[in-house]
Amino acid sequence: MSIMDYELKKITIKEAAEQLNVSAVSIHNWIKDGSLQKTNNFLTQKDIDDFRNNFLNSKKLSSRANKQYKDLHNHNSLSKEIRKALKSSMSGDLISSKYESSLSESYKNKEGIYYTPQYIVEDMMKDIVDVEGKTFLDPCCGSGNFIIEAIKKGISPENVYGFDVDENAVEITKKRIKEISGYESDNIICADFLSQKSKTKNQKFDYIFTNPPWGKKINKVDRLRYSSLYNSGSSIDTSALFYFACLKMLKEDGEIGMLMPDSFFNITTFEDARKSLLTLNISRLVDYGKAFKGLMTKAVAFVATKANSQQPTANSQIQCEIYNVKKHLRSQEGFLNVPKHIFNFHIEEKENDIIRQVYSLPHITLKDNAEWALGIITGNNEKLCRKERTEGLVPIFRGKDVFKDKMAEPSLFVNENLEGCRQVADLRLYKSPNKIIYRFISNKIVCFHDTEQRYVLNSANVFVLKDDFPVSYSQLVSLLNSDFMNWLFRSVFNTHKILRGDLEMLPIFHEYFKENEVFSEETFEVYKSISL
């Protein structure tokens, strides 16, 4: 291929993302803001090379769309360093630490890879004592932290298996195994466990402990294929797919431990996985908090036993822990009665009993009883929002402008016809004579009954009640803003976002409001004691 042919070679968005080690969304953003220039309306290799060479040091890297590129590492160069280190006298543990610390945040985010801290590995595996003749698998072994701990526990290295797609990590794991045991393992395989699993379907393991990729970007066709292969239902995030794949390779009476994103335990898309987990005998649920640098998501682990001969009973107890803060026991059966089978294990049994009682009261919900609208995304607040009102501009409000009894004075203004905005819902909902505005990013419900047809940015959302809804706007706002409802919301969902799906599952006590104009804790206690 000539230099000219090389430079004019057409490059797809996917190929560009792979070359620059970023998401396709970042490529689209760079094209949209003009940072990445197309040639004749398509990308060429020269466009990519020019961007790589000229844009990396540009001041434009401070913009949100480009933050992912700022900490990009050269993986080929890093791989050469690791291969050289593997042949040296440097210990495998040191190489492992060097490799993990050299991976950029953008790479880890793209691959869904966050290497498990040693204290979490030890804590998750602390109860393993029966090791004679037992087999162990880590299907996403990384540089081998769980695998090395299994060998330290006494599991024979010949019976320890691992998969990982990262060749560097696989070779580091093999070196560490040899250093700790003298055994040169052929059981650590560089392959995608989700696809490789089908080739090892007859092999089962006594112990499977792992930290699977969280939210790794895989194409839709593969995602649906894996979902069908492992019967994962609606749970198709990579962490859930690995859970179902692992379950198929676990022996009867085998034990499984997985470190998951906290969303696994409370978000609707993981409900099928939670239902499956509740058929196992769960021994521990542990919240390790924000365990990974640069990641806001909490890391939460479960440890459970697959025992068809001894299904969970009404007496089955789970040790629930906020790591190094508190421990308490919860009935496993109790999670079956929580909306969406959410694992709200941060609360104690007596609090869950109150939740069960509350949901037994006559109630309706907002599901199918309201129309919903997301807040407006301008795509560029600095350009489209003004701090002073001029002709043709109207107020637009943020989540932080929403209070229980008022809206803050307007401080931003936008073109009345919302021209140029990236996301706009049905204007009929924004301009409804009655609607409820609520904060989106918040750990408590804060909502306001709006009668002035206000616009809101996407840090707030809105909904409009159906005409036949039996509770008035003022009554509903008094309930949703109450300390009681916020306690209930926090106890069930335990999230920093106010999601529509969660609001739709809150109980609205329509019978109570037949006798009460607004909600109050005192009158509700009387109503509850009479109704139960």
Language-model regions, residue ranges each:
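Polybasic, glycine- and aromatic-enriched phosphate-binding surface used to engage nucleic acids
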Residues: Q19, A24, N29, I354-L532
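Residue-level detection of the helix-turn-helix DNA-binding "recognition helix"
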Residues: N29-D33, K175
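Conserved SAM-binding strand-loop segment of SAM-dependent methyltransferases
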Residues: G182-F193
